[in-house]
Amino acid sequence: MASKYAVKLQTDFDNPKWIKRHKFMFDYLDINGNGQITLDEIVSKASDDICKNLGATPAQTQRHQDCVEAFFRGCGLEYGKETKFPEFLEGWKNLANADLAKWARNEPTLIREWGDAVFDIFDKDGSGTITLDEWKAYGRISGISPSEEDCEKTFQHCDLDNSGELDVDEMTRQHLGFWYTLDPEADGLYGNGVP
């Protein structure tokens, strides 16, 4: 699955900004606030909260859940296994290295497969792209971009071809850069919502 968009492939795992970004995500995923996360918590949020509230079909929800499970297992998470932040961070490093190696070889990445699944849910009109309104619905429901301003900033950041709509390739490129490598082209991806 080749991409027309280049991404910075060098990681910067010791950068305090990268660590802070992942600490934000860890805290966001720690639903019960006990300082540990499990795959159970993540799947519950993804399937029971987000997919349900976006009106996903059972098939879409299952596909999305399969991708969420694969992605976070790539970070070392499992059902029933409590993971603290240092272990979570190490897992992200492993996931980032594995996905970036796949990206460099034009192979499907876990983040792209998850993107394909979530796009199928967002894309209500079946156009193959999502609109700003479709993105705003996700941002509001997921809580990752809770304000209209943050949603608009994310959308603008990801609209690499300036078409006024987003395709999964644009979103994947920006998320790889944001979560994996601190690519300056992806900085500010979630507006003020995520460091």
Swiss-Prot record:
Chain residues that bind Ca(2+) 2: D123, D125, S127, T129, E134
UniProt-annotated binding residues for Ca(2+) 3: D159, D161, S163, E165, E170
Domain EF-hand per the UniProt entry, residue ranges: 17-52, 53-88, 110-145, 146-181
Annotated transmembrane regions: none
Propeptide: 1-6
GO molecular function: calcium ion binding
Entry keyword set: Calcium, Luminescence, Metal-binding, Photoprotein, Repeat
Record Pfam families: EF-hand_5, EF-hand_7
Binding site for Ca(2+) 1: D30, N32, N34, Q36, E41
A Gene Ontology BP annotation from the UniProt entry: bioluminescence
CDD domains to which the protein is assigned, alphabetical: EFh
Family the UniProt entry places it in: Belongs to the aequorin family.
Function: Ca(2+)-dependent bioluminescence photoprotein. Displays an emission peak at 495 nm (blue light). Trace amounts of calcium ion trigger the intramolecular oxidation of the chromophore, coelenterazine into coelenteramide and CO(2) with the concomitant emission of light.
Listed name of the protein: Obelin
